[in-house]
Curated annotation (Swiss-Prot):
UniProt repeat feature ANK, residue ranges: 85-115, 117-141, 163-192
GO molecular function: inositol 1,4,5 trisphosphate binding; store-operated calcium channel activity
Entry function: Could mediate calcium entry and form a calcium permeant channel.
Subcellular location: Membrane
Compositional bias per record (Acidic residues), positions renumbered to this chain: 855-874
Organism of derivation: Caenorhabditis elegans
Protein's name in the database: Transient-receptor-potential-like protein
Length: 1027
């Protein structure tokens, strides 16, 4: 079938098809390609002039670039043209770090700089950024918040950076310290975004306009604010700024779930920055200044040398959960020094020495406490007041309390006689307290007073943030309820005659006060023994396990929420299925004996208990059977019971195990960090002064307490009279500084602060040092990263640009040297012809048909400048007209091209370093084998011949004899020989003879080169031979 027939058949089939609601064009039949889905700019869309312009910018070819900019054709070149990747020539030059090309492009009036400035900041070249920022097109507003409004629409659609990334934001994100500091000096700033729930007009407009763009703008801004460079250069207190910003970002991670990982990464970046600053501390004084800073008081210039510490910054770090900062070795070293203050040899002692020390302190515990009550300011009192001793004696006191609870639990009441003979104590409905219970009551009162003091000192919010305080609160409440009920029962049955006071417990009701009190006491004992786990945090082996247990309890709580939903659904379903079958009645079937029903799902409460105990295999499978012949009920009940077991045991319990394993693995991976953080929280509770005595000694009224009470009453009276103001700041300095006495003695012996190491330090001075060290360390780490792909690309671009520069310099040097030597040769020949015509006496003025040597050189330079673009023509001309000039051995001609020629500025190049070498041919007899070609100077200014017409005389000696100006005084432009000066005429004759010999040799050499040409002579410089 022919092509026309196939097309007609296809057309008929197409016409029989059902009409489409949206007709489509058949590109296959029309042989027309479908339109492109994505329009990508290719090299075919770029004009030849623009392509040449962009390639010159890419390769660093400055002459070609200048030629493209100077070209004035039919259509002016667009300096903002784009390549296939959407980059302008300025962006390409900045990306290649070609400063000369950038300066050349910036001279153009309509150049666009926007994205090029961002590229320069990305490359981190300070000089490029400085040149671009100082351009008139860049204003102060464009560097900060006004960047997106000032951008050109074509630049705003850049494929690399969005319009909301300003130069200062990009410099901060990349941690370019020098560039960011330069932008800050030009008043560039970053505005912190509003909170996520802000309902202002600006936020609502941006959110409704484009919610994604609004969120990305916030993230880019927070990336800049969270950068170490921005916080180091703009914040007076970088550590406090890092704490607050980290906390805000952590809250945003749970508010904007879509970008949770991004915000968490930025939060970790802020935490790491604060740790890096703390790592720069080099002495304990600097660490103390950092940890003792109070963010609520402007005390940057207050002396950090103080006998008391508050550790306000450390408390703030614990509040903001800066675990890495708190667990830092510098911080832990200071805390350890404070913790063991007064017991300096404890850390360096062995195991047995510490054991005997603890035993000694244990047995002297009551004596030390009583001595502290009597003499709180003595040396022994200071020892008892130390943090370690307070914790140790609190642990001893709590262990004693647990021992009393155990004793009270195992006390046998059933065989003790009551107040009335014949009745046991167990049957007394209002028994009095025993001496063990009285001691427990005393301990509970002491623990209650300790918690009240802690609540007063820390504040309600800080007290409630610690979960162990919740446990203490519940434990004390249970014991107080037990004591209250016991006292009430004793009062009721002691002061009121009741014949049923001594009754066997079998006849007691469930609401009996003693039964309620014993139940509460039992629960309180459970919490009391669980409280001892809190003390494990000081141990490096048990501490991580205790922390893992706390995380697992959170997982159990999550599991219980899901498990309650599952067990409730099955309990309600089974109760609905078995509600009719009462387990308390016997069922009698016809022709069978009566059977007792064992229905365990008759109510919702029974269903809950049955399903709960079934997890531990206590229930039986027969519990779903019924006595009646109701198979459908029995089958459905068995199916639901099986589904419950599969869901709860196979799925939920294994999920709980996996969750607990995951939590334990997280803690185990960061065991040291988590343990040190929680240990620090325990230590901080014992650092502050107060609560020095453990229960029950803390309820004893001491003389110090009486003085404090009287002082408080006196201040209250003064406050009522308006003569006293209470300070609301709770972060008062109460912690003793380790080694302060020794340091103070050293300062007194040194006679003041002459020594720099003993001078008082302020927080502002120390934070300035730390920031400077951090910046230096960061830059050092960046330099040690090694060579990457970008560095290799930059080296390649530098080599390419240098190659073009060397090629241009070489071409100019060849043309300039050739023209200069030709002019020298013509001057010499003109001089010889003049002297041959009038050898004796008189003078003859030559017709000035050619310019002088200097003028010829200047004209040659001008011609070189105009013809520099045509490289091949210059090389061809130099190849045809140049030979290497080698002077003879016995020649006394001055060093026209020698190294000793006086020049102002020259760049020397050996003739042998040209593109090709000399041809291997034998030299003439007049040449010597030890001869080395002279270096050819490149004159910075228009060159002049060493042998030239001057206003005075010849500037070189001839045969070792210099011409005196008194002998030869030619006028300007004329070579004169006087008849009276015969020695001068003889010298000219000698010069003429030597020149003739030299020309003969040159002609012979040129003839040999013509007969056997070699490519190696193309780059040699010599006299041009005119045929």
């Amino acid at each position: 079938m022919t092509k026309e027939g196939m097309l007609s058949a296809a057309g008929r089939r197409f016409s029989r098809c059902a009409p489409s609601p949206r007709p489509r064009r058949n590109y296959a039949l029309a042989n027309i390609p479908p339109p492109a889905a994505v329009h990508i700019r290719t090299n075919d869309m770029i004009s030849p002039e623009e392509r040449r312009f962009l390639e010159a910018a890419e390769l660093g070819n400055k002459p070609t670039l200048q030629e493209c900019l100077d070209y004035d054709g039919d259509r002016r070149l667009n300096v903002n043209c784009l390549d296939s990747m959407g980059r302008t020539a300025l962006e390409i030059a900045v990306d290649n770090e070609n400063m000369e090309v950038v300066e050349l492009l910036l001279q153009q009036p309509d150049i666009r700089i926007g994205n090029a400035l961002l590229c320069a900041i990305r490359e981190g070249v300070y000089r490029l950024v400085e040149v671009l920022v100082n351009h008139p097109n860049i204003t102060r507003e464009m560097l900060g918040d006004g960047w997106s409004q000032a951008l050109d629409p074509s630049e705003a659609a850049s494929a690399e950076y969005s319009s909301d990334i300003s130069p200062v934001i990009l410099a901060a994100q990349l941690n370019q310290f020098e560039i960011l500091q330069m932008l800050i000096r030009k008043d560039a700033s970053i505005e912190k975004p509003h909170r996520h729930s802000c309902i202002c007009e600006t936020c609502d407009r941006e959110r409704l306009n484009d919610s994604l763009q609004y969120s990305l703008k916030r993230i880019n801004t927070f990336r800049a604010l969270a950068s170490p460079a921005w916080m180091s250069l703009t914040s007076p207190d970088p550590i406090l700024s890092a704490f607050k910003l980290s906390w805000d970002l952590q809250r945003l991670a749970f508010e904007e779930h879509e970008f949770k990982e991004t915000y968490l990464q930025l939060s970790e970046q802020c935490k790491q920055y604060s740790c890096d600053l703390l790592s720069q501390c080099r002495s304990s004084e600097e660490v103390i200044a950092i940890l003792n800073k109070d963010g609520n008081v402007n005390d940057d210039n207050i002396d950090v040398w103080a006998s008391k510490l508050s550790l306000s910054r450390l408390k703030l770090a614990i509040k903001y959960e800066q675990k890495a900062f708190v667990s830092h070795p510098h911080c832990q070293q200071l805390l350890t020094s404070i913790w063991y203050e007064g017991i300096p040899y404890r850390q360096r002692s062995g195991t047995w020495a510490n054991f005997f020390l603890y035993a000694f302190l244990l047995f002297l515990w009551p004596i030390f406490c009583l001595m502290y009550i009597l003499m709180p300011k003595s040396r022994l009192g200071r020892l008892v007041r130390s943090p370690f001793m307070k914790f140790f004696y609190y642990s001893v006191s709590f262990a004693t309390f647990l021992g009393l609870l155990t004793w009270a639990t195992f006390e046998d009441y059933r065989y003790e006689k009551g107040e009335r003979g014949g009745m046991t104590r167990a049957s007394d409905r209002g028994p009095p307290a025993t001496w063990v219970e009285s001691l427990v009551f005393t301990w509970v009162i002491g623990m209650l007073w300790s918690e009240i003091k802690q609540l007063w000192e820390e504040g309600f919010k800080r007290y409630m943030r610690q979960w162990w305080n919740w446990l203490d609160f519940l434990m004390i409440c249970l014991y107080l309820c037990t004591i209250s009920i016991r006292l009430s029962a004793y009062y009721i049955f002691t002061y009121r005659e009741d014949p049923y006071r001594y009754t066997v417990r079998t006849y007691w009701t469930s609401e009996e006060p003693m039964l309620v009190a014993e139940a509460l006491f039992a629960v309180g004992n459970v919490f009391s023994f669980a409280r001892i786990i809190y003390l494990f945090q000081t141990n490096p082996y048990l501490g991580p396990l205790q922390i893992s247990l706390g995380c697992m309890l959170v997982d159990v709580a999550k599991f219980c929420f899901i498990f309650v939903l599952i067990i409730s659904s099955f309990s309600i379903g089974l109760a609905q299925l078995y509600w009719y079958y009462d387990p308390n009645t016997d069922v009698c079937l016809p022709g069978a004996t009566c059977k007792h029903s064992s229905n365990v799902f008759s109510s919702i409460a029974d269903s809950y208990l049955t399903l709960l105990w079934s997890l531990f295999s206590i229930t039986k499978p027969e519990d779903t059977d019924v006595v009646e012949n109701h198979k459908i009920t029995q089958w459905v009940g068995q199916g639901m019971f099986i589904m419950y077991h599969c869901t709860s045991i196979i799925v939920l319990l294994n999920m709980l195990i996996a969750m607990m394993s995951h939590s334990f693995q997280i803690i185990n991976d960061h065991a040291d960090l988590e343990w040190k953080f929680h240990r620090t929280k325990l230590w901080m509770a014992h650092f502050d002064e107060g609560s020095s005595l453990p229960p029950p000694f803390n309820i004893i009224v001491t003389p110090k307490s009486l003085i404090y009470v009287m002082n408080c009453l006196f201040n209250t009276v003064r406050w009522l009279l308006g003569k006293y103001t209470y300070q609301k700041n709770r972060n008062r300095a109460t912690i003793r500084r380790p080694g302060y006495s020794r340091k103070r003695n050293e300062m007194e012996k040194s006679g003041g602060h002459d020594d720099d190491s003993l001078k008082p330090l302020t927080y502002a001075d120390i934070i300035t040092r730390l920031v400077a060290r951090f910046i230096h360390q960061t830059k050092k780490d960046m330099k040690m990263d090694g060579v990457n792909e970008d560095d290799l690309h930059e080296i390649k671009q530098d080599i390419s640009s240098l190659r073009y520069e060397l090629r241009d310099d070489r071409r100019r040097e060849i043309v300039r040297s050739s023209s200069h030597i030709d002019a020298v040769k013509r001057d010499i020949m003109r001089t010889m012809s003049t002297t041959s015509r009038r050898p004796y006496g008189g003078s003859m003025r030559l017709p000035k048909t050619r310019p002088s040597v200097a003028e010829e050189s200047e004209e040659d330079d001008k011609s070189d400048e105009t013809s520099s673009t045509d490289e091949e023509a210059d090389e061809t001309r130099s190849r045809k007209s140049s030979v290497l000039y080698i002077p003879p051995v016995n020649s006394t001609l001055p060093g026209i091209i020698s190294e000793e020629a006086p020049v102002k500025k020259s760049t020397k190049r050996r003739a042998s370093e040209a593109d090709s070498k000399l041809p291997d041919r034998p030299l003439s007899d007049t040449y010597t084998s030890s001869f080395t070609p002279k270096l050819l100077p490149v004159f910075a200014q228009p060159p002049h011949s060493a042998l030239r017409k001057t206003d005075t005389s010849m500037s070189f000696p001839i045969n070792g004899t210099a011409l005196d100006t008194s002998i030869v005084k030619p006028p300007r432009g004329v070579l004169r020989a006087s008849q009276e000066n015969l020695p001068a005429v003889e010298l000219i004759e000698t010069l003429k003879k030597e020149m003739n010999e030299k020309l003969d040799r040159l002609i012979s050499g040129i003839s040999e080169n013509v007969k056997s040409p070699s490519p190696a002579s193309h780059s040699h410089v010599g006299f041009n031979v005119e045929k």
